[in-house]
A protein has these predicted regions:
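Nucleotide-activated chemistry modules centered on ATP-dependent adenylation/adenylyltransferase
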Residues: 1-232
Length: 232
């Protein structure tokens, strides 16, 4: 709520329509109805999202009466596959994530002062130190992770209590859902992101690596924010 009231129309939210992202969409819709402030929401469409993921986007838009921007990379999937001889996420996964996610993110954030993301600290070791309110130096923007200290159980309890729409692939064993060529269901006792980039040791797309610096770590303040805002 603080972020919405503080930044207003200068706040945006990124979502890949994971369970956590759906929770934030629902929360922002509730806050919109309470405050009259609508938050921009966008999705980075790599061209390889599951059909079920795209169907969920439409369902969320209808349920919460809120349109969600689609941001696409400059190179189409067909052009990338013709150039590489197959899906780029299989041929050059790191470059693919950079070209189809990291670069488009810069366009999506243009004109905004802060953005919200649905990452949790307990998802991967790389995310354990994520502050609730930090700074993304690559895009010179405040980065807010409202669910940073939530657990998977917290997320699904909220979903059940508020009847939040989610991806039907979760019912088929997909814990974390990314691009269809490199995402598989997870097995019992596997890490929830074990199904991403299946067959490799890749764990992150790059959107959240080195992009969460505590406000306290900056040499200059960001819109008056202080070190206190990073404490949880």
């Amino acid at each position: 709520r603080w972020a919405l009231e503080y930044y207003g129309e200068k706040l945006t939210m990124a979502t890949a329509f994971g369970a956590e992202g759906c929770v934030l969409v629902a929360m922002l819709a509730e806050l919109r109805d309470e405050t009259g402030i609508a938050t921009d929401i966008f999705n980075l469409d790599t061209g390889y999202q599951f059909p079920q993921t795209l169907a969920l986007k439409s369902k969320l838009e209808k349920r919460y009466n809120h349109s969600i921007r689609t941001i696409r990379p400059e190179e189409t999937p067909a052009a990338a596959e013709a150039r590489l001889g197959g899906p780029p996420c299989l041929k050059e996964p790191d470059v693919c994530c950079y070209n189809r996610k990291v670069v488009p993110l810069a366009r999506a954030l243009d004109g905004y002062e802060a953005y919200s993301t649905a990452v949790r600290r307990d998802q991967t070791p790389e995310r354990q130190g994520i502050p609730i309110i930090g700074f993304d130096p690559r895009h010179n923007i405040v980065k807010i992770a409202p669910l940073a200290n939530w657990t998977k159980e917290d997320v699904w309890n909220y979903i059940r209590e508020h009847d939040v729409p989610t991806n039907i692939l979760h019912e088929q064993g997909f814990a974390s859902i990314g691009c269809w060529p490199v995402t598989r269901p997870v097995q019992i006792n596997e890490d929830e992101r074990a199904g991403r980039w299946a067959g490799s040791d890749k764990r992150e797309c790059g959107l959240h690596l080195h992009s969460h610096l505590p406000i306290a770590g900056r040499s200059t303040p960001v819109d008056g924010l202080t070190a206190q805002t990073t404490k949880v």
